[in-house]
Design a protein with these regions (language model features):
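Cytoplasmic-side transmembrane-helix entry/capping segments in multi-pass membrane proteins
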Residues: 33-45, 101-105, 111-117, 121, ...
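Hydrophobic residues within alpha-helical transmembrane segments
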Residues: 117, 121, 159-162, 197-198, ...
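Membrane-embedded alpha-helical segments and adjacent helix-loop junctions characteristic
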Residues: 58-152, 384-388, 392, 396-478
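Transmembrane-helix bundle segments that line or gate the permeation/cavity pathway
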Residues: 150, 154, 160, 171, ...
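Hydrophobic transmembrane alpha-helices of multi-pass small-molecule transporters
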Residues: 1-92, 199-200, 212-423, 517, ...
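C-terminal transmembrane helix pair
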Residues: 194-200, 400, 404-407, 432-549
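Re-entrant/interfacial helical elements at transmembrane boundaries that shape
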Residues: 133-144, 157, 171-185, 420-424, ...
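The feature identifies polytopic integral membrane transport proteins across all domains of life
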Residues: 132, 153-161, 165, 180, ...
C-alpha cells in the first residue's frame, strides 16, 4: 500500500537523482568550505533525510549493503575494483598507447582506414579491459594525436566513446551493470557473454555505420592525412615485463571467473586474490628496480609529476610535434593522472574549497606538516610508481554512489514501489516476451539519463522485473535481463554525461586538456548512434529469444 512515507521516499529519491545529473555547490560562511551536492554526496544525504524521517530503518540499509534477492552489492564492488586495479596497472605499463601507435602506423595516411582501425582497436581493448581504462588512455592519446595531425577532434573522440561503451556489454566484468544483471537474474557469467555477443556485434557494426554517416564530410574525417610519419610503438611501452605479467594475470583471472561461475562460486573470491597477487608483484617489482637503480616505468621517473610528464613527452616526440607551447601544456596535463585532486575534477564533483586562514603559529605548523606529507608522497611515488599512479585512477567515487543507490532502491522496495512498478510492467506487456524486451530496453536507455547513471537504472529495473517475476515466464525474465544488459551499456552513449561514470570521466579528461564538449554537442552527436543501436540491439535480442524459446 502506498502511504505518505512512500511518496516522501520517491520524492527524495528523484531529487537526489536531480543533483547527480546537475550538481551544485552551496555557499556557506567564509571560514567553512562550500558544500557540494553531487554524485557522491546527494544519495548519502537522501539516505540521511529518509532515515531521519523514518522512511527507512537499519534493516533497509543493511539490505542495501549486504544485498537482497540474490543481488550482493559487496560482491559486485569487490569484483569490479579487483579487475579495475589489474586493468589500470596494465595500462600504466604503456601497452594501450603502444597498441594505439601500432594501429596508427597501420592506418598510414588514409583517413578512413585509420578511423576504422582505431574503432576496431578501441572495441577490442574495451572488451578485454572494460571501458574505464580505455577511456582514460584512449581519450588522452586521441587529443594529442588529433592536435598533431590537425584533425577535427570531435569525430574521433565521439567514436572512441561509443566504441568503448558498446564493447563493455560482452563480458560480465566489462561494466558494473553487467555484474548487477548476472547477480540479480542468476545469469551464468559465460552464458551472459553467449547472450550478448550477437547484440554487441550488431550494435558495434551499425554504430560505426551511423558514425560514418554523420562524419562523412571530409572536415571530420579527411580522405588523406597530412601527418604520415611512423610512430615508435616500443617507445611508449614503458614496462614490457610488467605488461606481460599484467596481461597474463588479467587473462587468467577472467578465464577463472568464467569457469567458477558454472559451480555457483562468488567470482570475487577469484578476482580478489588475483588483484592482491598483482599488488604484491607491483610492489616487489618496483622495489627491485628502485634498489637496482633501474629505470622506473622505463623512463626513470622520480616523482608524481615525472611519470606523467615523461609519458606525454614520449607521445609528443613520437608524434613529431614541433609546437613548444603545446609541449608545455601537455606536460602539465599529463596522463597517468597523478593526484587525487585531478581524479575529483575528472568525476566533476565540483568541490570548490575556500581555505580558512589560521593563526600564524597554526599556519606554520600546517605548512610544515604539508611539506612533510608532500615529500613523503614523492618519495613513495618514486619507490613504488606503479601503485601510486594506479591508486588515484581507481573509481573510488563508485563505492559511496553504488551503495547509496542500492540502499535508496531498497528503500523504494520497502515502501512498496517495486510492487507498483512491477504491476505497471505487467499491465503494459501482459507478460509477452517481446513487449517486455522492448519496454525494458527502451526504458533502460531513457533511465540511464535520468536515474543517476546506468548503474542506478540497472538496479532499479532489475528490482522491478524481479517484483513482477511471479507473473512472468522464465523465458520472459531471461529476455528482460538481456535487453537490460544491452540497454545499460549502449545507454551510456546517450544524451547526458551522467548517463555513466565513463561519461563523467571522459568529460573531465577533455576539460583538463582544454577541450570543452557541451551537453548539447554530446547529445547531438550521440543521438543517431544511440537510436540505431537501440533498434538493432533489441531486434537481435528478440531474434535470439525467438530461436532459443
Amino acid at each position: 500500500m502506498i502511504t505518505g512515507y512512500s511518496v516522501a521516499t520517491l520524492v527524495v529519491f528523484i531529487i537526489s537523482i536531480g543533483f547527480v545529473i546537475y550538481p551544485v555547490s552551496i555557499p556557506t560562511p567564509r571560514r567553512i568550505p562550500r558544500i557540494p551536492i553531487n554524485l557522491t554526496t546527494a544519495p548519502i544525504l537522501a539516505i540521511a533525510i529518509l532515515w531521519a524521517a523514518q522512511c527507512l530503518d537499519p534493516a533497509v540499509i543493511r539490505g542495501g549493503i549486504v544485498g537482497t534477492d540474490g543481488v550482493k552489492p559487496y560482491n559486485i564492488l569487490i569484483l569490479f575494483f579487483s579487475l579495475a586495479y589489474m586493468a589500470i596497472t596494465l595500462d600504466i605499463t604503456g601497452i594501450l598507447q603502444s597498441a594505439a601507435f601500432w594501429v596508427s602506423n597501420k592506418g598510414g595516411s588514409n583517413g578512413w582506414k585509420l578511423y576504422t582501425y582505431f574503432y576496431i582497436m578501441l572495441t577490442l581493448l574495451s572488451i578485454l579491459l572494460g571501458n574505464d581504462p580505455v577511456i582514460l588512455s584512449g581519450t588522452a592519446f586521441l587529443v594529442y594525436y588529433t592536435k598533431v595531425a590537425e584533425l577535427n577532434h570531435i569525430s574521433w573522440l565521439m567514436s572512441e566513446f561509443a566504441a568503448a561503451n558498446t564493447a563493455s556489454m560482452v563480458l560480465f566484468v566489462g561494466n558494473p551493470t553487467n555484474v548487477v544483471i548476472c547477480e540479480g537474474f542468476s545469469v551464468n557469467n559465460a552464458a551472459f557473454t553467449a547472450y550478448t555477443i550477437l547484440p554487441f556485434i550488431a550494435c558495434s557494426i551499425f554504430c560505426f555505420l551511423a558514425l560514418g554517416g554523420q562524419y562523412r564530410d571530409k572536415k571530420y574525417v579527411p580522405r588523406k592525412l597530412n601527418h604520415t610519419a611512423d610512430l615508435d610503438a616500443r617507445s611508449v611501452l614503458l614496462d614490457p615485463i610488467g605488461a606481460c605479467v599484467g596481461s597474463f594475470m588479467l587473462a587468467s583471472a577472467l578465464i577463472l571467473c568464467l569457469v567458477v561461475s558454472f559451480f555457483g562460486i562468488d567470482v570475487w573470491k577469484i578476482s580478489l586474490p588475483f588483484a592482491v597477487a598483482k599488488f604484491i608483484y607491483d610492489v616487489a617489482w618496483d622495489h627491485y628496480r628502485y634498489v637496482r637503480k633501474l629505470p622506473m616505468l622505463g623512463r626513470g621517473q622520480k616523482g608524481p609529476e615525472g611519470n606523467g610528464m615523461q609519458l606525454d613527452d614520449v607521445t609528443l616526440q613520437s608524434a613529431q610535434t614541433t609546437v613548444s607551447d603545446d609541449k608545455s601544456r601537455h606536460r602539465q596535463s599529463a596522463l597517468p593522472l597523478p593526484t587525487t585532486d585531478k581524479v575529483d575534477s575528472i568525476l566533476d564533483l565540483d568541490r570548490a574549497i575556500i581555505n580558512k586562514s589560521p593563526p600564524p603559529s597554526s599556519k606554520t605548523f600546517v605548512a610544515q606538516w604539508r611539506s612533510k606529507a608532500i615529500a613523503l608522497h614523492k618519495q613513495l611515488h618514486a619507490h613504488f610508481p606503479t601503485f601510486f599512479t594506479a591508486l588515484p585512477r581507481l573509481p573510488f567515487a563508485l563505492v559511496p554512489f553504488a551503495f547509496s543507490q542500492f540502499i535508496l532502491i531498497e528503500a523504494l522496495s520497502h515502501q512498496g514501489w517495486m510492487d507498483v512498478f512491477g504491476t505497471w510492467l505487467l499491465r503494459a506487456t501482459h507478460g509477452d516476451m517481446y513487449r517486455t524486451i522492448w519496454l525494458i530496453g527502451v526504458l533502460g536507455v531513457i533511465l540511464c539519463n535520468i536515474s543517476g547513471t546506468n548503474i542506478g537504472a540497472t538496479i532499479l529495473l532489475t528490482k522491478v522485473v524481479r517484483a513482477a517475476s511471479p507473473m512472468l515466464s522464465d523465458q520472459t525474465i531471461r529476455a528482460a535481463a538481456i535487453a537490460l544488459a544491452v540497454a545499460s551499456n549502449i545507454g551510456a552513449v546517450s544524451f547526458t554525461f551522467s548517463a555513466s561514470l565513463a561519461g563523467l570521466l571522459w568529460r573531465g579528461i577533455l576539460k583538463q586538456k582544454g577541450i570543452i564538449v557541451s551537453q548539447t554537442t554530446f547529445a547531438y552527436w550521440n543521438a543517431l548512434p544511440l537510436v540505431v543501436m537501440t533498434v538493432v540491439g533489441l531486434s537481435v535480442v528478440c531474434a535470439e529469444m525467438a530461436v532459443l524459446y
